[in-house]
Design a protein with these regions (language model features):
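Transmembrane alpha-helices that form the ion-translocation and gating core
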Residues: 61-130, 264, 269-388
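Membrane-interface alpha-helices at helix entry/exit sites of multi-pass transporters
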Residues: 131-145, 152, 166-170, 249-250, ...
């Protein structure tokens, strides 16, 4: 719980800093922002490499994972689609309900609700002495597939934002090569896996993706550049590693510290939401979401509660499957999937790169904050249900 509360604290500190720093730094702010964004990408790459390291499947039994993958995909898709509909039909005026650009923007932004925080989840269940239970083993598979589905779907969403250009085929080609390499050589790379090496690999991945963008932007112009998000390349790097569990106090402190820095930087990346500067930015916005007028804080909070409820209702998909298990086990499995964290925050940051903003962005960030606040309640709920019906696995 201390880690969850720290996530919340650093995210909130970042949100406060995002409103104060532009005025405090003045003309130096753009340089500071560029440095902070670079650090954020490196932290996100570090997190995704570790998610990839956790992705361990027996390829000889790949058919047995099919049902789990489709359940995880549905568990990621339902909250996403519910929030897309909410953002379109509740937040936007009716004349934009059929606007294709509005749908594209909200399809990308709403994806923050899809991923489950695997790190928070596994730590939580292990601390409850449930590591040998069916719930733990099943949720481990679902949470990883959940994150994988989020990463993969970001590719067509990115293509949707770009439009039907030649870069789309280049991006698809890179994605196909990465997926084939990840599957073909999964867990084959026998490499040192301490936090320094993983952070270094993350920096290399970020440098390569940024270099590709800079070179193609110089050759073809920013509008025709190739921009590969760091999520999938970093995940595949983690997949290639022959997993080694390095559970030392130093490793735990380093990994936790990088996650805290990531949440702080995500908060700091938010645009101004109050004052004349925020109004001017909304008036000059190039996206539909960012051009929407800011709402009163009381109305925003009501939307945050509604979006949080929808995102968690959507995560109840596993209740309707695994009928050979008790209802309490299936409910515990679903509630465990309520936890959100770094990957969802990463999706919000990527959405910012496409100039998305406005009330929908603020609601998304505050929904993540509310979810972190409620994580303690989710822990207690899962504990009661799981210990009531815990079935150890052989």
């Amino acid at each position: 719980m201390r880690k969850v509360l720290s996530f919340l604290l650093f995210l909130m500190l970042g949100l406060v800093a995002s409103q104060l720093l532009p005025g405090a730094l003045g003309t130096a702010y753009p340089g500071f922002k560029a440095t902070a964004d670079t650090l954020l990408y490196i932290c996100l790459g570090f997190i995704m490499i570790n998610v990839g390291r956790e992705f361990e499947i027996d390829k000889s039994r790949w058919r047995s994972y099919t049902a789990d993958y489709f359940i995880a995909m549905a568990t990621a898709a339902l909250p996403w689609l519910l929030i897309v509909l909410y953002y379109i039909f509740v937040l936007l005026p009716s004349d934009l309900w059929t606007d294709s650009a509005a749908w594209k923007e909200n399809l990308l932004l709403s994806r923050f609700a899809a991923p489950t925080s695997a790190g928070i989840l596994f730590t939580m269940l292990a601390a409850l002495s449930l590591k040998n239970s069916w719930i733990y083993r099943k949720i481990q598979v679902l949470a990883i597939f959940d994150d994988l589905d989020t990463i993969l779907l970001m590719i067509p969403l990115q293509i949707l934002m770009i439009g039907l250009k030649w870069q789309m085929f280049a991006i698809v080609g890179v994605v196909v090569v990465l997926l084939i390499a990840g599957w073909r050589w999964q867990a084959r790379w026998n490499v040192r896996q301490d936090w320094k090496r993983i952070l270094g690999l993350s920096a290399v991945v970020c440098a390569l993706t940024q270099a590709l963008y800079i070179v193609t932007a110089r050759w073809y112009g920013p509008e025709n550049s190739i921009h590969i998000e760091v999520l999938l390349p970093a995940f595949v790097i983690g997949m290639l590693m022959k997993h080694r569990e390095i559970d030392t106090p130093t490793e735990r402190r380093a990994a936790t510290g990088i996650s805290f820095l990531f949440m702080l930087l995500v908060g700091m990346s938010m645009p101004l939401v109050t004052g004349a500067s925020a109004a001017a930015a909304a008036a000059a916005a190039t996206s539909i979401t960012a051009s929407q007028p800011m709402m009163p804080w009381g109305v925003l909070i009501l939307h945050v509660v509604a979006v949080s409820a929808l995102s968690n209702i959507g995560k109840l998909v596993p209740v309707f499957f695994y009928r050979d298990r008790k209802l309490s086990e299936r409910l515990a499995l679903s509630i465990g999937m309520f936890t959100r964290g770094e990957v969802g925050a990463g999706v919000i940051f990527i959405a910012l790169g496409y100039s998305l903003g406005g009330p929908a962005l603020i609601i998304s960030v505050l929904t993540l904050v509310l979810n972190l606040i409620l994580t303690g309640g989710f822990v207690v709920w899962v504990k009661k249900l799981a210990l009531k019906s815990c079935t150890p696995e052989a």
